[in-house]
């Protein structure tokens, strides 16, 4: 049975959540988690840079085998969806920079997996 360390990212510009789980067969165990919180006083480019650097630091420290990033949820606020998409883009770029394979999941799929309904 091969163990695999997986980094999950819930992208956001105000708060970007991340978590690491170790997958061993059908068993998952928590390894670490955290939140990257760029200053709201910074300009957009600086905040995106903080998210990118934060995810790169997590990858450097924990050396995950793969990553999973939540897809953007599009609602009636197009501007918010575009900004979230940019945060998601830097999360994908950080994983790609480290050569990680990235799986992408819809928010409803993640919610169903975690709480049983979506």
What annotation goes with each model-predicted range?
Residues 1-118:
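Phosphate- and other anionic-substrate recognition elements at nucleic-acid/protein interfaces
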């Amino acid at each position: 049975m091969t163990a695999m360390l997986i980094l999950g990212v819930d992208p956001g510009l105000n708060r970007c959540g991340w978590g690491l789980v170790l997958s061993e067969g059908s068993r998952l165990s928590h390894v670490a988690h955290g939140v990257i919180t760029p200053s709201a006083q910074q300009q957009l480019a600086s905040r995106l840079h903080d998210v990118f650097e934060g995810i790169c630091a997590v990858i450097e420290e924990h050396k995950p085998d793969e990553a999973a990033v939540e897809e953007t949820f599009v609602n009636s606020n197009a501007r918010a969806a575009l900004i979230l998409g940019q945060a998601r883009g830097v999360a994908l770029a950080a994983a790609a920079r480290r050569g990680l394979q990235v799986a992408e999941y819809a928010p409803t799929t993640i919610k169903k997996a975690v709480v049983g309904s979506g």
